[in-house]
Amino acid sequence: MSLQSDSGGDELSPPPITKDQVLRLGDERFHPDNVAVVTGAASGIGRATAIALAVNGLTVVGLDVDEAGLDDTVETVESLDADGRAVAAAADLTDDAETEAAVEAAAEEGQIRYLANIAGMQHISPISEFPMEAYDDMTDVMVRAPFLLSKLVMPHVRATDDGVGAVGNMSSVHGRYATRDKATYITAKHALNGLTRSIAAEGEGTLRGFSVSAGYVLTPLMADQIADTAEKRDITEEAVIKDVMLGQARTEELMMPVEVANLFVFGFSSHAKHLNGGDLLFDGGYTKTYE
């Protein structure tokens, strides 16, 4: 597993993304006149997905509250000499007006065909101690915002010349099974799976809905979770990675954000035209095998 530190210390972070790591597909709709809206684009999987889609030629409008992180994403796309481009649209996904304004701004950049609902949050706590404020924040970002964004984006897709497009939702292995101390995250991911199927049911075949369920991915969210879990269970961070996160997996390494981003590239492409209501499960055997 290739890891590095952001600042020369012990903090885990993925290596910088290069063009060679990106799945590149010659899709006729992957060009700068078509827009992909990507949430959580300031870091982690959202940033990697924004970069990968821009490398494939799309105009990507990245949404996040982290303006500095969005600027870094845009600069990375420019440094890679991508065939497409990235545009920052700072927005608080818990604010309907800001979310609506961000979609309107995206529509000014071209035809919106794709939406990647990736923004996420985590809080580690048992149900009996879970703060409802954290529950509200997490479900606002990971359930309500994807629903609202889908509601706003779907008419734009239908207004294109052929009505072809897709909404990709970032689910998780926790959308398939449950572990302790993550009840709200698990609830949200199960809800996203329901939204995915509902989009497929209403998309009339050309507007698809799909989800991506990854195992443990090395993101800032995951790095924080490692520390929180170690504290909650009174074990080392190394034990969290080896035993808690990868203990059931057959591919015994954390995924990198760009590996997940490549699944969104495929899911949005014409190669995935029969991926509708379905889920791309890439978990290293975590949920489908046992000792």
What positions do the PLM features span?
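Conserved glycine-rich Rossmann-like NAD(P)H-binding loop of the short-chain dehydrogenase/reductase
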Residues: 58-72
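Substrate-binding pocket helix/loop in short-chain dehydrogenase/reductase
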Residues: 126-127, 131-139, 245
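Active-site loop immediately N-terminal to the catalytic Tyr-X3-Lys motif
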Residues: 128, 177-184, 252, 270
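Short, small/polar-rich loop/turn modules that mediate ligand/substrate recognition or access, typified
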Residues: 204-208, 275-277
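Active-site helix of classical SDR
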Residues: 150, 188
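Short C-terminal tail/terminal secondary-structure segment
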Residues: 2-30, 177, 265, 270-271, ...
